[in-house]
Amino acid sequence: MTIKPCFCAAMMTILTRASNNQPVSLGKQIASSGEGVVWETNLSGYLAKIYHDPTVERIKKLEVMVGNPPADPMLSRNHIAIAWPDDLLKDGSGAAVGFLMPAVRQSRELPSIYNPRLRKRNAPGFNWYYLHATALNTAWIIQAIHAKGYVLGDIKPQNILVNDSALVAVIDTDSFQVRDLQTGQVYRCTVGSEGFTPVELLGKDFSVTDQTEIHDRFRLAVMIHYLLFGYHPFSGEWTGSGESPDQTELIRKGFWYGGQNSLIRPSQNTIPLDVVHPEIERCFLKCFNDGHTAPHLRPTAE
């Protein structure tokens, strides 16, 4: 398969699936980013992502992903939980320019669920039980991804979608860290989101850093804390001298409101940590206290 150095949707005449040469036509544009554009297609249940710059490395990474998908833990519920690349897409010259992926319908971005004001407006029926169910389903999905050796790397709440039944879907999966099990080549996740980067990765150059699922454990714990409490665990009322450090510095120092000798305490009118089941509380303490100096002690997604 040949790979063109760049691709412009306006220049496109024909797209075909790499696996069987089935024609694919693009419909309405539904999202755009620095990497590429996501389109509706003529294939029921599928979207296409077309890259602005489909580099050799990007396409090789996709080939590994297409050939080794994770098990979808929600298939028995007739729900797409992982918007995984399903097939490469070629243009009329045979160059790979993007990929097909399953569409996730009738779902909201995670912040509209964990933010109390947005939840009241957009999902008033989402109660304490549904928030727990969403957290559990998120952990199941991440466990399935880890089981295949993948690392999410950059967890954006906007890339986790939730429907009215608390069923979860992860999108933007082509940004994950991928390891080719045959060659050992690692296709890294080169970016990170503020507030979701564990202490041992702060200041690291992600383009040359191999990540592990241990790093994802911190990210998952932050995400679940957002879901159950509505705010970031490394936030609250600063009790030290001077102005409160920014969130990245609080993570670096291990200052969260449940930490020993922490200079952060819960803000007024926030939900206390001990309101959740003792086992969930133990997981948070294990992750943010013990895991600060010994990352391998963070609870796994499983």
Positions of predicted regions on the chain:
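The N-lobe alphaC helix and its flanking beta3-alphaC-beta4 segment of protein kinase-like domains
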Residues: 54-78
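Conserved structural core of kinase catalytic domains
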Residues: 80-134
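ATP-binding glycine-rich phosphate-binding loop
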Residues: 12-57, 79-80, 91
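Catalytic-loop of the protein kinase fold
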Residues: 142, 146-165
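Conserved end of the kinase activation segment
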Residues: 201-214
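Conserved C-terminal segment of Hanks-type protein kinase catalytic domains
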Residues: 296-302
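Activation segment/activation loop of eukaryotic-type protein kinase catalytic domains
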Residues: 158-201
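Conserved C-lobe activation region of Hanks-type protein kinase-like domains
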Residues: 213-215, 224-281
